[in-house]
């Protein structure tokens, strides 16, 4: 018996399996880790540009595995498809080419995402129904807002490597977002990244305690001066 090949997708359309996803325990461990700390631990070279939170409550954070979508600017057909494929805890990350002329997601899609128990949405493009997004519950990061709606014609691809507001995002990457922006990390880097992040958080906690103490004890401020001067001397400065 001859096997029947699966029907081919038209050019520009594709839906792929996501493949590797982060260990749920690792995802949970990253909740509450600031994006600034993760960015520093990744060499200060990764992070979104031009995205801002639109979910109202700046204390609301995003943490989950990426389900990536690439769309034609101004078209959201494949985002609708992605919503039907998403699992609880996923983050839909959309490469909309940074176009802000037409909204790619609105209030109805927000409700669909909430029903799917998504961890959040990141859109390199516009959203609309801003008041509804600002109610919170679902973290959303986007490049802008537009009242003009999208088309639903395609093409588009799901679970492919994408570029999103300066980020290189692959399906299954860990996505973190907070008031400072969005960062991503590949699943295989998470164990060592988590260790580094915890060490940095411990260092910062120590520094915070020192600064608080120095408000009441001026003698402690000399430590800060010496630390800065040591950095300058290492660069040849005569201090």
Q: Positions of the model-derived regions?
A:
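C-terminal binding/interaction regions
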Residues: 175
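Feature captures the catalytic cores and cofactor-binding loops of soluble hydro-lyases/lyases
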Residues: 2-171, 184-239
């Amino acid at each position: 018996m001859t096997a029947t090949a699966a029907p081919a997708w038209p050019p520009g359309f594709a839906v792929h399996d996501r493949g590797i996803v982060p260990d749920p325990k690792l995802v949970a461990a990253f909740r509450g880790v600031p994006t600034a700390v993760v960015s520093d631990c990744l060499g200060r070279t990764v992070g979104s540009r031009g995205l801002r939170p639109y979910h109202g409550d700046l204390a609301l954070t995003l943490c989950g595995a990426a389900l990536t979508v690439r769309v034609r600017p101004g078209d959201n057909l494949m985002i609708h498809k992605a919503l039907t494929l998403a699992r609880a805890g996923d983050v839909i990350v959309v490469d909309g080419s940074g176009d802000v002329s037409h909204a790619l997601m609105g209030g109805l899609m927000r409700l669909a995402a909430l029903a799917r128990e998504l961890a959040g949405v990141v859109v390199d493009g516009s959203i609309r129904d801003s008041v509804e997004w600002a109610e919170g519950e679902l973290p959303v990061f986007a490049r802008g807002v537009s009242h003009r709606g999208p088309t639903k014609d395609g093409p588009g691809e799901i679970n492919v490597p994408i570029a999103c507001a300066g980020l290189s995002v692959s399906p299954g990457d860990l996505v973190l977002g907070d008031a400072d922006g969005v960062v991503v990390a590949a699943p295989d880097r998470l164990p060592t990244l988590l260790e580094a992040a915890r060490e940095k958080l411990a260092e910062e906690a120590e520094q915070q305690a020192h600064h608080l103490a120095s408000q009441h004890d001026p003698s402690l401020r000399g430590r800060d001066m010496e630390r800065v001067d040591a950095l300058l001397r290492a660069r040849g400065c005569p201090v």
